[in-house]
């Protein structure tokens, strides 16, 4: 729900239609956050265009069926992350929100104080947070947790993320003898079995002193 009222749409010349079936069967272009229900998908006709966030790997069969019916489907999370497409990069914006929300939700369910509190009766230590993965969502989680007074640790297979984590006040956990597992496009690549074992050992030791894990 976008939070816009019907009158706001009417003011810019939009026609309000209450019958969902009419909209789906008559529209040439349909913008939808998630994939339509199975019943509504049956209402679509050839040469219509669907634009939205459709989780194509999960909904592969449904999308293939739409393609067979000559329906165009544009799943925005599959847009290439290139300069020309930056204004339509929904992954970064949604990942930012996901990182922020993960911290807020976890802190709301945490039964202790987040920042360190010093009183005459004693000191309450700050909560320790581990963020696994320092991509867009991870960096936002680190920044949010740090602003709220937590002690933040983070790990990532891409060594270039170390500087980003530390710039936000986080402590970067480095695997001994680690290599930079980053592709030319900035994504993480497959790690060796030896690296994975070292990473597991590092996390196993770290988790013993962590209050909240975000991954």
Regions found by a protein language model. Name each.
Residues 38, 42-128:
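Glycine/serine-rich phosphate-binding loop and adjoining beta1-alpha1 elements at the start
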């Amino acid at each position: 729900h976008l939070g816009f009222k019907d009158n706001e749409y009417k003011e810019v010349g939009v026609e309000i239609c209450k019958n969902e079936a009419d909209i789906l069967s008559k529209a040439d272009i349909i913008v939808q956050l998630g994939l339509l229900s199975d019943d509504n998908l049956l209402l679509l006709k050839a040469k219509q265009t669907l634009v939205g966030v459709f989780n194509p790997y999960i909904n592969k069969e449904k999308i293939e069926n739409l393609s067979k019916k000559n329906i165009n489907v544009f799943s925005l999370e599959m847009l290439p992350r290139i300069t020309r497409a930056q204004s339509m990069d929904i992954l970064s914006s949604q990942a930012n929100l996901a990182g922020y929300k993960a911290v807020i939700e976890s802190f709301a369910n945490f039964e202790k104080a987040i920042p360190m509190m010093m009183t005459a009766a004693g000191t309450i230590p700050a909560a320790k947070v581990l963020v696994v993965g320092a991509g867009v969502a991870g960096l936002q989680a680190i920044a949010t947790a740090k602003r709220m007074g937590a002690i933040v640790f983070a790990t990532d297979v891409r060594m270039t993320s170390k500087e980003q984590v530390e710039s936000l006040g986080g402590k970067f956990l480095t695997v001994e003898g680690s290599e930079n597992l980053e592709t030319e496009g900035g994504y993480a690549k497959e790690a060796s079995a030896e690296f994975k074992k070292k990473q597991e050992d590092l996390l196993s030791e770290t988790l013993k002193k962590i209050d909240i894990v975000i991954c």
